[in-house]
Amino acid sequence: RRQRQMCIRDSRAALGVLRIILDAELDLPLDKAVTLTLEALGHGIVKDPTAIGTAVLDFFQDRMRVYFREEGFRTDQINAVLSRQPHQILDARKRLEALARFLTEHQAAEALAALIKRVNNLLRKENVEVQHDPDPQLFEDPAEHRLWEHWQVMAGPVHTHLQNAQYASALDLLAGLRPTVDTFFDKVMVLAENPEIRQNRLTLLTRLQDAFLRIADFTQLQGS
């Protein structure tokens, strides 16, 4: 019983810390805060700071999930965001607010999320890891050119919004990709027999995937 009471007190204390961070809009990374706290305590008091730090962060992660659920966010949305931003609760809530609004207000949101899942599955299946842009000289279909040109136009503004934590604005722009992406999948066989063409098409898709992943892991969304 005493242990249960301590757990309840610890949970309330953790929720209190999270509430203070959010109310004061503190840009405080939890992992850094925990590390600095353990360093201040010293090795004489903390025998295994790495293990304790991991346990504390896991505990706060659980409390963050509870806190965000109490704020009305869906569990799958919380998981999607925390998988990309597990330590900065203020930034995580900005992402959650933007994601929830996007899924509620944009007609294309659910379909676009499904397309991003499809892209992710293709890239994972093909084990694609690229550090460069696609080569337009290898495009064979006008739909490839249109998608790449569309992405090049919006890439700069999207990047700026993401750098400034303007996630809602970034998602508004990304939503505009939906018709072009639809046409791409209707017209283009991504897994072409020619390995060079196939790799180039997958490289193009990684650019879209990367932009969405900088906000949340859309593969964890369950749909409405």
Predicted regions and their residues:
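Amphipathic alpha-helical "coupling" segments that flank catalytic cores
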Residues: R1-Q5, R9-S224
